[in-house]
Amino acid sequence: MARQATKLIANLSKKLSSSNPHTRCSEQTVWIGAAPPAVFVDKNTRVICQGITGKNGTFHTEQAIEYGTKMVGGVTPKKGGTEHLGLPVFNTVEEAKAETKANASVIYVPPPFAAAAIMEGLEAELDLIVCITEGIPQHDMVRVKAALKKQSRTRLIGPNCPGIIKPGECKIGIMPGYIHKPGRIGIVSRSGTLTYEAVFQTTAVGLGQSTCVGIGGDPFNGTNFVDCLEKFIADPQTEGIVLIGEIGGTAEEDAAALIKESGTQKPVVAFIAGLTAPPGRRMGHAGAIVSGGKGTAQDKIKALKEAGVTVCESPAKIGVSMLEVFKQRGLV
């Protein structure tokens, strides 16, 4: 089965690369009766679940429906034509999109087949794909990343992430919905559990969240800090930003550069995990490793502070730090 999945990825990658990029890039989503979401999702987002009949797909689809997310169908090969949780099940993403008018997908598919599921969503030209799966082979994700760069229609969030939520409107992923409260803070994080910590704290101090995005901890992901920060900076509902990073890579340094260049007046509070991590040892996530003298917490903290970001020494201080900055600037 794993060989079949790898073969499918290769075939789809070739097909994507052979298509006319100018034609693909010029296509625009038509949002009937509503503007496109400020930060990837809103109450109008129509979601299908790839892997809906599996244990994880079933549980989290139930949770999403209870939260109020517009779940419109699911995809499980060879189970097309059936129903699950009261939703129609299709054999392919293309069929599901045609029948349900879905514009987003969430993936709960085992690691050997997850990359093929992402590529299927790309082929169907969905606006958003959220991949929760952890442990996807890096070789598979390199091919997915290459395919993503050849088009501009579809955005991938993840893999190995908790997902994305706009409190009170749309929950796509595994995060606990009840800790979120509609509000003023945009949160972007490489860590799932630290995202929940930041959410709980910003809710506790009365600020709430505009949108929360878990970008995942793998080396090859679809959406990075810069992508999210650009959206948060432009979003009128987002008045402050929380950024949670970790050792490894240069994503946090890139984020610091954008914050500096943008000249945004929105307060940014950050926490970087892994300050005491030894070089060369992976800390939890596949991308959380200091190698070649790069990716240290100290470098990231320095870059963020130089960009005017308030950097917390402890994740327990994220909420109170943001509230203090809001008070200093007369925002509360």
UniProtKB/Swiss-Prot annotation:
Source taxon at top rank: Eukaryota
Primary location group: mitochondrion
InterPro entries assigned: Cit_synth/succinyl-CoA_lig_AS, Citrt_syn/SCS-alpha_CS, CoA-bd, CoA_lig_alpha, NAD(P)-bd_dom_sf, SUCC_ACL_C, Succinyl-CoA_synth-like
Family matches, as PROSITE patterns: SUCCINYL_COA_LIG_1, SUCCINYL_COA_LIG_2
Keyword Nucleotide-binding among UniProt keywords: yes
This protein's record includes keyword Membrane: no
Catalytic activity: succinate + ATP + CoA = succinyl-CoA + ADP + phosphate
Active-site positions on this chain: H285
Positions bound to CoA: T53, G54, K55, N56, K79, I132, T133, E134
Molecular-function GO term, any one: succinate-CoA ligase (GDP-forming) activity
Tissues expressing the protein: Expressed in roots, stems, flowers, leaves and fruits.
Purpose of the protein: Succinyl-CoA synthetase functions in the citric acid cycle (TCA), coupling the hydrolysis of succinyl-CoA to the synthesis of ATP and thus represents the only step of substrate-level phosphorylation in the TCA. The alpha subunit of the enzyme binds the substrates coenzyme A and phosphate, while succinate binding and nucleotide specificity is provided by the beta subunit.
Family from the record: Belongs to the succinate/malate CoA ligase alpha subunit family.
Protein's name according to its UniProt entry: Succinate--CoA ligase [ADP-forming] subunit alpha-1, mitochondrial
Source organism: Solanum lycopersicum
